[in-house]
């Protein structure tokens, strides 16, 4: 019996969901490091509150505004290894942040970290849905638990590993990036297998893509 690829999977893939939750935890942990090290940057680089605000703006722009752009792109061209690619951006930004000697370098670093998050979240959410076996509420909850946990652990680790020793110890968080990439490998293999099955399935059984509404209907719906 051929599995209908319009459905996520026939049964919930708990190992994949756990790996995604761990990946989300590590990603959001790394993202939360940025705000936690603001006092260090203010003291070390003599930054004003306005400059600290600029750091936040650049990070939020890259971490939030770019998400739908990447989501739209990967909707049309899904790539199995997107997750580790996003984490590589984050790792590069974290290493740069550890040794940034001026505001421009800091801005470049947080931009890379934000891009990593923008790349990761849309595809991770998609794979979470695919691995849910139809139990999307449970799957999404597991995914969100990881992110919330990571966001709360980041500042604590900064207090333990960075604050007593200096900003250069931010580079230690690159180790967590590598761990996240290792955790993502089985997820990517699973997703690659799914994409392969979709491509090889008969045309009539391939999932139907949602078409955008015409402009007049879109405006009417919003209004």
Specify the residue positions occupied by each region the protein language model found.
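Extracytoplasmic
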Residues: 19-39, 47-49, 70
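Cytoplasmic helix-loop-helix junction between adjacent transmembrane helices
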Residues: 109-146
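Conserved MFS/SLC helix-loop-helix module at the cytosolic interface between two early adjacent transmembrane helices
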Residues: 65-103
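Helix-loop-helix hairpin linking two adjacent transmembrane segments in secondary transporters
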Residues: 143-192
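Short hydrophobic/alpha-helical segments at membrane-entry points of transmembrane helices
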Residues: 20, 104-110
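Flexible cytoplasmic inter-helical loops of multi-pass small-molecule transporters
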Residues: 186-212
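Residue-level signature of mid-helix packing/kink "hotspots" within the transmembrane helices
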Residues: 32, 60-68, 151-152
């Amino acid at each position: 019996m051929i599995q209908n690829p319009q459905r996520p999977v026939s049964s919930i893939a708990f190992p994949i969901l756990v790996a995604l939750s761990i990946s989300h935890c590590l990603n959001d942990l790394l993202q939360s490091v940025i705000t936690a090290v603001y006092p260090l940057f203010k003291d070390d680089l003599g930054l004003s509150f306005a400059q600290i605000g600029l750091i936040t703006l650049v990070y939020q722009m890259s971490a939030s505004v770019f998400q739908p752009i990447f989501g739209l792109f990967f909707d049309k061209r899904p790539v199995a290894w997107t997750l580790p690619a996003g984490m590589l951006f984050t790792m590069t930004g974290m290493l740069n942040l550890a040794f940034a000697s001026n505001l421009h370098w800091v801005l470049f670093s947080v931009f890379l970290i934000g891009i990593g998050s923008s790349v990761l979240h849309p595809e991770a959410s998609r794979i979470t849905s695919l691995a849910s076996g139809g139990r999307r509420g449970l799957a999404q909850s597991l995914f969100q638990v990881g992110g919330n946990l990571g966001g709360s652990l980041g500042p604590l680790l900064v207090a333990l590993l960075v604050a007593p020793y200096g900003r250069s110890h931010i580079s230690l968080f690159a180790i967590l990036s590598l761990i996240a990439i290792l955790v993502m490998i089985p997820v990517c293999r699973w997703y690659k297998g799914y994409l392969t099955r979709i491509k090889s399935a008969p045309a009539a059984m391939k999932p139907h893509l949602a078409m955008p509404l015409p402009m007049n209907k879109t405006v009417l719906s919003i209004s």
